[in-house]
Amino acid sequence: MILKYSLLGNLLLLWMNIVNSVVLVGLYYGFLTTFSIGPSYLLLLRTRVMKEGSEKEVSATTAFIMGQFIIFISTYYPPLHLALSRPHTLTVLVLPYLLLHFLFFWNNHKSLFDHRSTHGNFIPNLSIQYVFLNNLIFQLFNHFILPSSTLTRLVDISMFRCNNKILFVISSFFGWLIGHILLMKSIGLVLSWPWEKMRSNALFRSNKYLVSKWRNSVSQIFSILLFITCVCYLGRMPSPIITKKLKESSKGEEKKKTEKERDVEMETISKTKKIEQEEERSVEEDLSISLEGRWNPYKIYETEEIRLNGKEKDEFGFKEKEKNELLWVEKSLLSLLFDYQRWNRPLRYIENDRFSNAVRNEMSQYFFNTCASDGKQIISFTYPPSLSTFFEMIQKKMYFRTAEKLPAEDLSNEWVSTTEKQRDNLRNEFINRIEAIDKGSLILDVVEKRARLCNDEEEQECLPKFYDPLLNGPYRGTIKKGYLYSIRNDSITSIQGSTKISWINKIHGILSKDYREFEHEIYKLDVKSSSAGIDDSSVSIGEFTEEAEEAEESRTRFKQFAFWGEEKEINSENQAEFLFDMVRADPNDQKISNQSIKIEEMKKKVPRWLYKLTADFDFEEEEEEEEEEDDEEEPTDDHGIRSRKAKRVVIYTDTDTDEDTDTNIINTTDSDQAKNSDQAKNSDQAKKSDQAKNSDQAEEHEMALIRYSQQSDFRRDIIKGSMRAQRRKTVTWEMFQTDVHSPLFLDRIDKTPLFSFDISRMMNLIFRNWMEEKSLKLKRKTSDYAGEGAKEEEHEEEKREYKRKEDKRQEDERIAIAEAWDTIPFAQAVRSSLLVTHSILRKYIVLPSLIIVKNIGRMLLFQFPEWYEDFKEWSREMHVKCTYNGVQLSETEFPKDWLTDGIQIKILFPFSLKPWRRSKLRSHHRDLRKKQKNFCFLTVWGVETELPFGSPRKNPFFFEPIHKTLEKKIRKVKKKGFFILKILKDNIKGFLEIFKEKIRWVIKIVLFIKSKVIFFFRLTRVFDPIPNNKDSKISNRIIHESPIRIGSRDWANDSLTERKINDLADKTIKIRDQVEKIMKDKKKKITESQKYIWQISKKRSARLIPKWNSFMKSFIERIYMGILLCITNIYKINVKFFLDSTLDSTKKILNRYTYNDETKEKDTNETNPNIIPFISTIKSLSTYTTTISSNSHSPIYCDLSSLSQAYVFYKLLQTQVSNKYKSESIFQYYRTYPFIKDRIKDYFHNYFHTRGISDSESKHKKLRNSGMNEWKNWLRNHYQYNLSRAKWSGLAPLKWRNKVNQHRTIKNNDLQKLDSYEEKDQLIHSEIKDFYKLGLLKSPSHTKKMKKHYRYDLLSYKYINYEYVKDSNIYGSPLQVNRHGEILSLSNYNTHKYKSFYVITINDCLEDKYIIDTDQNLDRKYFELRIIYFYPRNDIETRTSTDIGTFTKKNKTTKTGTNKKDLYIRIHQEIQTKQKEFFFDWMGMNEQMLDRTISNLDPWFLPEFVPLYDRYRTNPWIIPIKLLLFDFNGNKKSDLYIDPKVKSNQKERSNPKAESNQKEYLELENRNRDEKERQHQGNLISDTRNQKKDVGANSTGSDIKKRRKKKKFKSKKEAELDLLLKKYFLFQLRWGDSFNQRMTNNIKVYCLLLRLMDPSEIAISSIERGEMGLDVMLIHKDLSLPELIKRGIFIIEPVRLSTKWDGISIMYQTIAISLTHKVQHQTNRGYQAKKHIDENYFNGSIACHGGVRVNGDNNNYDLLVPENILSPNHRREFRIISRFNYRNRNVVNKNPVFFNRAKTNAQGFEKFVDRDKHFDTDTNNSLKWKVFLWPTHRLEDLACMNRYWFDTNNGSRFSMSRIHMYQRFGIR
């Protein structure tokens, strides 16, 4: 079995080696390159298809393989790669060959190569060589089928990673060869099929002509394909001949300027004869070039290169001019064929501020290179190019170094050994420092100090932090790059020269050895001017470039200094720089003699474009200067950049200056003729100048507008003549399309239905009207039940919305039509001609003809004609010519270039033909605005429209008035006829009624007579209705015979009454039957419903039976919780209220008589007069608390997949100190035993272990791999992530930010120590002075930074020791620890109510909200809550201090004062008042509580929420907004302003002693604050002596400056206005939309009125129409801003305050995580904390209950980091070195011991560690230092942690090379 496993392992190892080998990777990539087919495949296939012979096939295949091999070699050989990859080089080489190939060789190769002469001297056959050359050259072409650039990059990267590059190239070539053979074999099988068919065909075998014809056709097909391929390939490049020539920069001007400067320099050189001429010329030329380049940065450096390696130039460079003239012919020839300096790609020109010519985009910021990391060469993907070029230059100069390279293993071993030595040295130093502490040395002598560069050691005066080279980080600054023009010259006396002061690097000696001697004189640099522009970032002191000044006395006096940082200078010369080794000053003549090093500047010429491009509508100042200097040169309109499609439209031309221009022309011509002698030339020049001036004056007096095209211009800002990109993924399918779109996203963009595949959208388009009508009907039906007012409002809103959409749709249609006319060629000319034609026809032909016809018709109808009225109205109609946008010009003047730019014709007072003058036409729409618009525009079809390109409007019909009059007359006639018919109808109706009554009377008489006759004859008949009813019951009754004889009657002889009786009987029977039927149905339904209800109740009861028990339980619990607890709490509240009231009354009585007694109760408290409705807050917080408490002991299910680890890590770093782990974490941190005393440890251990709060025993745990599971376990132990699965899944991103982040752990300010600390003030102040003396505590900000470093350290330890994370915590600096504190017994405490472990205080849940830009000026317009200060209540009470979860101590000596547990808002020294009423009464904190009754109605039914309530009372950050706007005390006369100067003069009814104590306390606080502010307003140079003097009672003050005083308001309105402005501090003014439209309309009307002789009528009509606004005309130039705002011209838009971030700050915050300290959230920054620091803080690492008086918060620290003895740099270095195991990187199960001496000699630790029974069981956890594994985390986590571990304060030093992204190939 063992043999089998070993064989399997060997095979697996062999397979892994083969897979990772260079050969296999090369074969793989080579095989992939087979599918990138180029044009040479066509030639290769042609030889195989044509069957021209085996020799040609072999030559073609050989050339093909050789070309591919050259391509592979080019990847290894850079010159060949550049030659083949450069498109210009390849184009120049290939174009002549292609020209000869297609024009000459392709048609004549048979006659040239196949000609065989019978003579002896015959021409050899060159067809084989021709095929070889074709296949070889075409193989070098770029691929056009599957041109995978990604594949090429992968090949380059793979070769870059390989050690054996030649082996990789060869293997990739063989891989390609294998793929090529397989491809050719497969193609050969396909191509052999047509030849087999031809051979089997008898026709082809017999007819050779068909075979030759087929061969020629195939040859032509291949030639066409090859030609198309070459054209497509060359189409990607610019045309070499047909190209747009751009205007180059004016070289002539530069040459003239350089010549003038050199002439001036020649004069200065001739005057100075102290130095040799040749050296002086070289220096002057160098300086002139640098002066030319620095002083005028807009020039292009075309000067010659200066050679400094022993070769001297000719005198003043005249030979270079001749060389330039000779080279001009070559350059012109090259630029004629192909201009390599022009823009070949569709690049957009971005003009630079310093250089007018743009820099070529050929270099990137980062590129690949190898660098050393951990002793090995690995790849870096962000290697800076500047470092690489510098290293190459150094290697070239370092010729004395050996070229041999050590193996990689030796380098790694050497690095490991040196690192281990360094680690041992640091360990020894660290242990020696700890032993020194144990021996009793002062901590100040042991701690490693930071080195500073001092100016005076005795005075202890240091350099400013900006200029201290020994400091790094945020203290350093950056000198801005710029030009300094202020140089101090008055202080220099008898100076003949000047030199440059600069720092010399040691490396200059390696680069150059050219030493020369010069005599120079002292020149001092103005330090103030150089330090004027310094930013807060890392400094980079660059070179001081000097430049000459033209002067007679001084030879080389510098004119300016340019500071260049780490930026490459853009210059085409290798300037020389003289750096002086040493300077020796002579006080007599101030001359120096030194040696200078002449060094070539190490720089690279950055490629820049030769052309200075201008846009079409840019008017450059350089052209104007050229015209002024040389009048003969006419300005050229050769613009190189395409601007937005626009046209210049002249709207007004002023012709009043013609006379002035004529007189000026005459004067100029006379003066020119008088000055010059040659009359002919002068006259010509005068004419030219006159024409130019006339044209200039004409242009100056033209008022023009720029009309931009509405459609998108995809060519905007693209350089003319540059090649467009082949947009394979962009499609335009509409005439008017705003943007180009890709077909890939066709389903996501708005498109026409033709290209739409969305069926639902098409259905919506088809049935849109039907659906809208249906929805409107539904809305109306549902709105019927609402009120009438709501209906009308909804209807009006629908109408407005519909009108808005319709207007927008019509506007889009008009724009589309306008752009269509403007896009189609020659469309504007056609349209303009049609408009003019229609205008003439309408004005002079159509309308007069209609007038004539109308009047003739009136005369034929015998009516008076209206000739005068009609022609008068016709004469009012005006056809005004307008621009394409509608700007009115005049009736006779056409716009400039109106045939090409377009025209509009506006008809004012349009004529409408009427049947008669008295008739008033009414349009269909009763809109008053439309009545006022008595104008229209003319369309192409000759109809009228209201807007240009709008829909035609409906003109009133001529016969409409006639039709209306006829309708009125017909209506009148009908009305009269209806009246007559009504009268006749009424009369006829009355007659008929009388006639009917008469007939009834006659019938009655006849019936009466008939009845009498029947009765007379006694003929009767008995009526029996029962047999006639079928449904009735038949009764068998015996009918007795009547003694009376009954006669029979017939139905016909029956009377009317009998019939009625019969009918009534039938109806009653039917009704009775129906009632019976309904009763039966009802009974049946009732029985069925009863059965159904019984079934339902039976089912539900069966369901409810199992739930009955739980229901009863929950019901009983509700009753208990809701009723019983309420009763008990009410009883409790009443009892407490009674007790408190009695205690308060007794205390007041005692205070009246014992206010002079010094032994009073220390703890004081206030009552709350205004009760805050806190129930809602309690409910919300209780739900959150119960959720956490219920989940505290349940399994946690968290899904951290969507949460970035960097985000979590950043938030955890922001977690501040939480004291709820205060006591539990101390005794569980066993690794802190060496630094914790035994009695402290035993006390906490026994105390908590007896109560079972946590387990105190630890076990030996094996170090597991720090992976994702451990990371999640670490996160789960933080309660803010301890949520249930339902809660976790329900958290939205916004909720996560608003809730979880706000509920993160912060400092608990409620835990307070009450010991007095006054006894140790003197000792502490002396200690603080010592700390200031050493520079450890420079400022409070320095202390905060120290605390921040401790949090960084402890966070790292916390994660490394994640198995103990439940007990650990992140605390602050141990410098705040009090070693004199004692652990008291339980009997010393008043109360010891223990806080439940799951209860979270308000400090853990609510954090001060972060307000942006808290350091802004208070006079800015924004409202800040921190500037409002309050008084404490004057009625101060004393009580016994009780707290939940804290230990309080009752002191013997107490004094009266406010309890610091209740952090009331502090009193500012400048805010005092004499008023009682305040506008802002935040929870009664401003109220004078003298007349109030004492009450304490805190909600005690939930005791654990009392800290929440107290925190809510005292924390102004969580106050509702309503409390800012209402005065709950009923104060009506309130003012926002509180006068800080007026002191309180009221006589309070409070305790006078307490008030006096308060005043003394406030004065002390104010004095201390003034002292500490004076202390930290320091100058640039920090003086420790002044610091000693300024240190007062405060140990750590703040460097925050005093806030400015508020302005005093005159009235309440002004105060309210200021309050409004404070909310919005930024304003932006914008034009109102309505005003903008009105101004545009006014301008259009002005253009017309200026051209009219009598504009009154047009002006009045324009005002009536609403086109011209009088309010806009009355705008003056000197109107103030309030007036403009009042008129509605400007609108104020407030903008919220936001933070402006730059790239550096974003990078710093991303990589360098900065903690959000609580100092940023302090309520009153004027009140500063008092924090004291012990001397020997290592012996008392636990903050005991000593009297540390702080700003309401004390920190207890459970872990002390001993590394802080070292400096930060050594600390990080020691931590990194001690954590990594260099010999074996598999460190999962290996725990390197921190101290090597602990393994051999345990007594080394006994000196400073107290041994006990628990030490042996936990030694490993105390002494071992575990390894942090980097590769198990994401990149963002590495970036976050990398800032801390590797001391990268800024992001520039963070390199991705530390991440091993690829494994290097080994040499097999």
Curated annotation (Swiss-Prot):
Any one GO BP annotation for this protein: protein transport
TM regions (residue ranges): 11-31, 64-84, 87-107, 126-146, 166-186, 221-241
Acidic residues bias: start-end ranges: 617-636
Compartments, as annotated in UniProt: Plastid, Chloroplast inner membrane
Protein transport recorded as keyword: yes
One GO cellular component, as annotated: chloroplast inner membrane
Database matches in InterPro entries: TIC214 (IPR008896)
Pfam families: Ycf1
Chain positions covered by the region annotation Disordered: 248-277, 617-643, 658-700, 782-806, 1537-1607
Biased segments, Basic and acidic residues type: 248-276, 684-700, 789-806, 1537-1576
UniProt entry tagged with the keyword Transport: yes
UniProt feature, compositional bias: Polar residues: 674-683
Function: Involved in protein precursor import into chloroplasts. May be part of an intermediate translocation complex acting as a protein-conducting channel at the inner envelope.
Subunit structure: Part of the Tic complex.
Similarity comment text for this entry: Belongs to the TIC214 family.
Name under which the protein is recorded: Protein TIC 214
Organism of derivation: Nuphar advena (Common spatterdock)
Protein's gene: TIC214
